[in-house]
Regions:
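Phosphate/diphosphate-binding glycine-rich loops and adjacent basic-rich segments that engage nucleotide
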Residues: 1-36
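Glycine-/charge-enriched secondary-structure boundary and capping motifs
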Residues: 33-50, 54-178
Length: 178
């Protein structure tokens, strides 16, 4: 519904997506698995690249019990652009505010070292958001608080809006404000 909030839950890193490209970028960089990963507070390349995927089930169940969760999507292959539209009616779009969440350093490193754009990072990888939930605006802060109680980080990353037309008449269902 127009006006609903989109809450994003942090990923732990790559999860299970984009490893072919990440491996190519890693090879280009010359970093070795035991090297310190740039900007990762002493974690090694191996630890950053193979960080275990977060399991969201307990936090999600908590919200489903008591809140009006209108949609949810696991941000897997296809990133924001392929996964978020799966939970939206055709007449609306997700407007995502880039920078409204804390992105793990691996994504900035992949962008810079791999000469990628931010849209590519959000298409190929999860960009630091592993799961999204759509809720009424008056429930998003409570949702974030509950998610944090499970030692997960969460943010209000965007809103649902009436779907707009692009310059060529095409419509996109995920619009990221960079």
């Amino acid at each position: 519904q127009v006006g609903d909030h989109i809450v994003g839950i942090a990923s732990s890193g790559l999860h299970s997506n984009g490893y072919s490209l990440a491996r190519k970028v890693l090879e280009k960089s010359g970093l070795k698995p035991e090297d310190a990963f740039p900007g990762a507070d002493g974690a090694t390349v191996r630890e950053v690249m193979l960080a275990p995927t977060i399991i969201y089930v307990e936090a999600v169940r908590s919200l489903l019990r008591d809140l009006n969760v209108k949609g949810m999507a696991h941000i897997t292959g296809g990133g924001f652009y392929d996964n978020i539209p799966r939970v939206l009616p055709a007449q609306v779009e997700a407007r995502i505010n880039f920078g409204s969440w804390q992105m793990p350093p691996v994504f900035r490193w992949l962008k810079e070292t791999g000469d990628l754009s931010w849209p590519e990072i959000l298409q190929i990888f999860n960009g630091g958001i592993g799961y999204v939930m759509v809720l009424p605006p008056d429930q998003s802060e409570e949702a974030i608080s509950r998610i944090q109680a499970f030692n997960l980080r969460a943010w209000h990353i965007g809103d649902v809006a009436r779907r707009s037309k692009g310059d060529g008449g095409e419509t996109e269902q995920v619009v990221v404000n960079f």
